[in-house]
Amino acid sequence: MAERRRRLGDWGEAVAVAYLAQHGYQVVAQKWRCAAGEIDIVAQRDGVLAFVEVRTRRGVDPGMAAGSITGAKRARLMMLACLFLAAHDLPADTPWRIDVVAIAVASQGRVAIDHILAAVEET
């Protein structure tokens, strides 16, 4: 079961990268890791860095995937974004946000993608 879930997640990340590229984003990093965790995708468009969390689920509603991000995950994503900026010596005033690309895969193989800009904000 874990292998199947990992393959679905990897497939979803590849779909998200293609989607972002089609919408004018330049992918800066994929699966960026540090001791605190992983950022699925870091992309840039119009001078703004987007730290992208990809959520892939089976079903017909991408909202189900987006809704699976807990408060703890939101806090971790904020921390990871700050760690990425520091690790790459980017200025503190670098514009950035955390997006979610939610992907739903229906049983018929139809794919729905929802790109939620600034889905995670500081609280």
Swiss-Prot record:
Name used for this protein in its record: UPF0102 protein RoseRS_1723
Question: Which family, according to the similarity comment?
Answer: Belongs to the UPF0102 family.
GO terms for molecular function, please?
nucleic acid binding
Q: Which SUPFAM superfamilies match?
A: Restriction endonuclease-like
Question: Gene3D superfamilies of this UniProt entry?
Answer: 3.40.1350.10
Give the species this sequence originates from: Roseiflexus sp. (strain RS-1)
InterPro entries referenced in this protein's UniProt entry, alphabetically: Restrct_endonuc-II-like (IPR011335), tRNA_endonuc-like_dom_sf (IPR011856), UPF0102_YraN-like (IPR003509)
Pfam families in alphabetical order: UPF0102
